[in-house]
Structure formats: structure tokens, C-alpha cells
UniProtKB/Swiss-Prot annotation:
Protein name in UniProt: FACT complex subunit POB3
Function noted in UniProt: Component of the FACT complex, a general chromatin factor that acts to reorganize nucleosomes. The FACT complex is involved in multiple processes that require DNA as a template such as mRNA elongation, DNA replication and DNA repair. During transcription elongation the FACT complex acts as a histone chaperone that both destabilizes and restores nucleosomal structure.
Species the sequence originates in: Mycosarcoma maydis (Corn smut fungus)
Matching PANTHER family: FACT COMPLEX SUBUNIT SSRP1
Further remark: In contrast to the orthologous protein in animals and plants, this protein does not contain a HMG box DNA-binding domain. This function may instead be provided by the HMG box of the associated NHP6 protein in the FACT complex of fungi.
Region (Disordered): 162-186, 495-558
Length: 558
């Protein structure tokens, strides 16, 4: 019977619960000291090499694994490394001795740089991206955690999956309660890193047939491009290794804008464009909408994503695909009938001969497990299922669906009826009653407010009735404005009548005064002092004194 060696207070991966690590001739195992967490076992023949490194939680034993021949070749589905933290410095000799005794392999000690420099050398190994400072390791990132890589001139960005997506097998339970508790206990995590890679790299293609032009043009590439291509190759995030279920070519994606080839795999899809690539797990798809466009020529498939995909600092929580309504295609899935029946319950077909949008929607629906929401009974004044309106400076279409409002443009806005506190109907800036448009302000229970602007006045009754049927609280400020305008108009009419009567009376007095002035020209001095508001105002202004000075001069001439 082989002996067993044990270490206490050892952490596995990113787990916050310590456990016990046991090592024997047949392999090693780890289980948490408290709770009902997963037990990790690694057979001896799967361990390729061992590394000792200083980390935040004392020292780490990194175990590099042999690649499982039966597993898919994607790095994300076949982790190549597992870590155990919590060893103390004095454990090195004991651990090294037992690894050599049980597995006949050395324990390599890796030096760590503590200079704190943010410049150095980026190196890609079979398992990690390593950042070296003076040939010492500053940090390393497992390739199995890398979800995507993009390049912009001399800058290479790397995007990372969250822990649930990195190691789905490490979850301890499947219930919502356990999942919620697990998510709450997690702290900050790395989601993106950018490296500035200047300079040129010479591409060694080993071809003797290359021409002089090829040597000048094709053999040279930037160091950033070489690093980017190496990342894609090692992490399997470019042309994904393995067999895809189906590929859709040159699909127009409105958000983020561009044409992409969509590779469909069993657990994720990959969007491959000219500049950007995206890997999207089906587990991150939480909403599907199939919507007709107002032009009646195209159909949109809107996919809600959580977490959203990223393009630099821009986050895209929705993916908007557009298809011509009449476009059809023949597609054959790379699946056998047994897999379709057993794994997908017969919900997929081996061969499709249908409109493209129906094929894509059906495949995404089955693989993601999400229902597809479509417009139901709402009809606008023009017979459409949507209403044209604006959000801020962007124009788009508002779709009143059965359970939510969905505004589709560059950045869609989704508002479930259950989260609406109040819907407010108002005119633009309190415009007059003849205004042809109005605004819909939606205040949510969380305090967020969405304003859909410049909606045609003809849609008011239909939209109000639709929201009322969904038990949405409605405040119609337009009715209040109309009542206020009516009262103001009535008051205005009354004041206009009074002014006309007073004006008529004032006109008669002026005529009489003018007649008196003509008959009694000699008494003009007394007329000049007659009490009138106009004359008194002019006297206060000083104009009347000038006129009074001229009249006595005329009398002296007579």
C-alpha cells in the first residue's frame, strides 16, 4: 500500500475556501475543509510538469496537464493548468521530494520580478502569456482564460472570461441559490488587458519561392501583429480548432457594425470580422427577439448578452443581426442523427432549406435554451409592429412587445413592463395643442428614466391603450396641458373683448378731442395741460417741454 502525504490550508484556483491536498503514487486530490465543495482529483499520468512560484497567497504549486486526446482542442474547454495556493516557504523541499518520489518529475522554482515596472517582454508559451522584466516573471495569464484578442496598430488587447466561464466544472451546485451566493462572494476580476507592442517583426515563412516583392511586403509585419497572431494560434481563438456545427458567411451585424462570419459550435459561437473577433457563449445569451423592420424587406435578430461583449471601452449588451426577409439558404449541420435526437431532443434538423433568418434563429434558440420573443397584436397607425421615435440624437424603432418595450437602434433599450414605475406622455417642451409629436418618458422602479422622443401624434391612443392593457401606470401630461391651454384661451378671448370695447370708447374720445382742438385753437395752452396718460408720460420724459417752448414764439409773431 502506497503512502500518502497531506498539506493543510491549501486553496484550489480562485476558491476562497481552504482545503486539504493529498498526494500519493496514483495522483493527487483536494477537497475543501468545510462545506460541500467539489473534490478535485488528478491522476498521475495527466500531470506533465510542476512549478513553484510566489503569489499573493504565499506560494503556489502550478501543475501543467497533459492534453486530453478525447477532449476538444479548444483551450477553454480543456484547461491545461491547475493551481494550488497557500504553501509556505518551508514546504518547497518536502513538496519537491514527494513529487520526484511519486511522479518522477522535478519541481521547478520560478523567480518573480518585484521591480514594479510596466515595461518588459511579453512571451507566449504553450500554456500562458508571460510578462518578463529582466528575464524574471512579473505576471502570467493562463491561455485557457483568454476569450478574445484584438489589435489596433501597435496595441493588442486581451479579453478574459469570468471564473464561471473559465472553469464551469468547478461550480459546486446547480441551484439558483448556490449560484447567487457564489456570484456575491466574488470580488473584482480581470476582464481586459492591453499591451503596447512597438516595432517590426520579420515573418519567417521558410518559402524559397517568395519573390522580391513578397519579401518587401509580406515578410515584414509589426510586432503587434505577430504577437496577436501568436495569441490567436495558441489560445485557439481565431480560426477555432475543432469541427463547427455550421458556418454562416458574411452576416450583416448592425451592433457592433460590420460583416462577420459566424462559426457555430456546441457551447459558443464565434464572430470573425476583418478587424474584430468575438467569442460568445450560449450561457451569456439571455434574450432573443425576432423583429420585422419597418421597410418590410429585412428582419432583425436581437440577442441580449450578459456579460456584454466589448470593443475597447465600448460595451455591447445586445447583438443585432439583420437578414433579408426573402433570402434562403441550404444548410447542413455537422451533427449525426443520434446526436440531434439525444443531445438536442430532436429540435434541430440535419438539413435546412428555409429563409436564412429562420435557420439562424432556430439554431440559436435550441443551443441557448432561450425563448424567442416576437411582436404580437400591436399595430401602429401605418400598420407596422413598431413606432418610429428617437432616443437622444439617435433614431430607431420602438417595439411594444407582450412583456416589454424594446427600442432598436445602435444601442437597443429594453424595458420590461414589470420594471416600469410610471409612463409619462408629454409634448415636446409643452408645445401647443396642434403639435404633431409627443414624448414617452418611462420611469423604472430602479430610478432610471428612458425618453422616447418625437413619436407621431397618431400613435398616442394606440400606445396608451397598449400600456394600459399591460397594467402600466400612465400619467398623461398632455391632457393637463390641453386643459390649461383651454383655460388660457378662454381668458384670452375675454380680455380681447374688453380691450376692443375700451378701445372703441377711447377712439370716440379721441375724435371729440380732435374736434374741440379744431374749434378752439386759441385755447391750445389749456389743451396742452389736459390730464392724459400719454401726455403725462411724455412730460415726464421731457419731450413735452420742447413743444411748449415753440408755441409762445408763434403767438409773438401774430
Amino acid at each position: 500500500m502506497s503512502s500518502t502525504t497531506q498539506w493543510e490550508n491549501i486553496y484550489h484556483g480562485l476558491d476562497t475556501t481552504p482545503g486539504k491536498l493529498r498526494m500519493s503514487q496514483g495522483g493527487l486530490g483536494w477537497k475543501p475543509s468545510v462545506g460541500e465543495g467539489s473534490t478535485i482529483t488528478i491522476p498521475a499520468d495527466q500531470m506533465a510538469s510542476f512549478q513553484w512560484i510566489r503569489v499573493a497567497r504565499n506560494y503556489q504549486l502550478a501543475i501543467y496537464l497533459n492534453k486530453d486526446r478525447d477532449a476538444p482542442s479548444s483551450a477553454q474547454t480543456n484547461p491545461r493548468r491547475t493551481n494550488f495556493d497557500g504553501f509556505v516557504r518551508d514546504d518547497f523541499d518536502r513538496l519537491s521530494s514527494h513529487i520526484r518520489q511519486y511522479f518522477n518529475k522535478p519541481l521547478e522554482a520560478k523567480e518573480v520580478s518585484t521591480r514594479g515596472w510596466n515595461w518588459g517582454q511579453a512571451k507566449i508559451s504553450n500554456h500562458d502569456v508571460q510578462f518578463l522584466v529582466r528575464d524574471k516573471l512579473a505576471f502570467e495569464l493562463p491561455l485557457s482564460h483568454l476569450a478574445n484578442s484584438n489589435i489596433a496598430k501597435t496595441e493588442v488587447s486581451m479579453e478574459f472570461l469570468n471564473p464561471e466561464q473559465q472553469q464551469p466544472g468547478a461550480n459546486t451546485g446547480t441551484s439558483d441559490v448556490n449560484g447567487t451566493k457564489s456570484r456575491r462572494s466574488k470580488g473584482d476580476q480581470l476582464v481586459e488587458m492591453r499591451l503596447y507592442v512597438p516595432g517590426q517583426a520579420i515573418k519567417d515563412d521558410g518559402s524559397d519561392a517568395a519573390s522580391a516583392q513578397d519579401d518587401d511586403v509580406n515578410n515584414e509585419e509589426t510586432a503587434a501583429e505577430a504577437f496577436h497572431e501568436a495569441l490567436k494560434s495558441k489560445a485557439d481563438i481565431g480560426q477555432v480548432a475543432g469541427d463547427s456545427i455550421v458556418v454562416f458567411k458574411e452576416v450583416l451585424v448592425l451592433t457592433p457594425r460590420g460583416r462577420y462570419d459566424i462559426d457555430v459550435f456546441s457551447t459558443f459561437i464565434r464572430l470573425r470580422g476583418k478587424t474584430y473577433d468575438y467569442k460568445i457563449l450560449y450561457s451569456s445569451m439571455n434574450k432573443l427577439f425576432l423583429l420585422p423592420k419597418a421597410d418590410e424587406i429585412h428582419v432583425m435578430l436581437v440577442i441580449g448578452l450578459d456579460p456584454p461583449i466589448r470593443q475597447g471601452q465600448t460595451r455591447y449588451p445586445y447583438l443585432v443581426l439583420q437578414f433579408p426577409r426573402e433570402e434562403e439558404m441550404d444548410a447542413e449541420l455537422n451533427l449525426d442523427e443520434q446526436t440531434i435526437q439525444e443531445k438536442y431532443d430532436g429540435k434541430l434538423k440535419k438539413r435546412y432549406e428555409e429563409p436564412t433568418f429562420r435557420i439562424v434563429t432556430n439554431i440559436f434558440k435550441v443551443l441557448s435554451g432561450q425563448k424567442v420573443a416576437t411582436p404580437t397584436d400591436f399595430e401602429s397607425s401605418s400598420g407596422q409592429t413598431s413606432i418610429k421615435c428617437n432616443v437622444k440624437a439617435a433614431d430607431g424603432n420602438l417595439y411594444p412587445l407582450e412583456k416589454s418595450l424594446l427600442w432598436v437602434s445602435k444601442q437597443p433599450v429594453y424595458v420590461p413592463y414589470s420594471e416600469i414605475h410610471q409612463a409619462i406622455l408629454s409634448r415636446v417642451g409643452g408645445a401647443v395643442a396642434s403639435s404633431k409629436t409627443f414624448d414617452l418618458r418611462v420611469a423604472t422602479k430602479s430610478g432610471t428614466e428612458h425618453t422616447f422622443q418625437s413619436i407621431s401624434r397618431e400613435e398616442l391612443d394606440r400606445l396608451k391603450a397598449w400600456l394600459a392593457d399591460r397594467k402600466v401606470r400612465i400619467k398623461n401630461e398632455m391632457a393637463e396641458e390641453t386643459g390649461g391651454l383651454a383655460a388660457a384661451a378662454a381668458a384670452g378671448l375675454l380680455s380681447d373683448d374688453d380691450d376692443e370695447e375700451m378701445g372703441a370708447a377711447g377712439g370716440a374720445d379721441e375724435d371729440e378731442d380732435s374736434e374741440e382742438d379744431a374749434d378752439f385753437a386759441a385755447d391750445s395752452d389749456s389743451d396742452g395741460g389736459s390730464p392724459s396718460e400719454a401726455s403725462s408720460d411724455e412730460g415726464e420724459g421731457g419731450g413735452y417741454d420742447d413743444e411748449g417752448d415753440e408755441r409762445p414764439k408763434k403767438k409773438r409773431k401774430d
